[in-house]
Amino acid sequence: MKTTTLHVYVMFAEMRGIYDKVNIKIGVSDNPKKRLKGVQTGCPGDVHLIRTFEAGQDAYIHEGHFHKLYKEFSTGGEWFEFDNDYFVEKVLPEMIEYF
């Protein structure tokens, strides 16, 4: 029986004309590259896979942790909007340290 490895992923969606904010998707997938293609289909701008973290069976717990931690930045569902500097200097390092 094949075991599926789950990942928590971080994606960035480009938004035309907006340069001081980043739109970030934090989610779970067993195939983040395939998930990226699905997300790209629904977005007008380019979407990039920034980082994946192998999370195993607890992937949804880890995802939920970050959704709660950043709920004030939520724009709906798994999407969050951060100032560029805040994301680069605080959010991404927190996620890397967490995993």
Model-identified regions with their sequence ranges:
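Non-catalytic accessory segments flanking enzymatic or RNA/DNA-binding domains
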Residues: 1-99
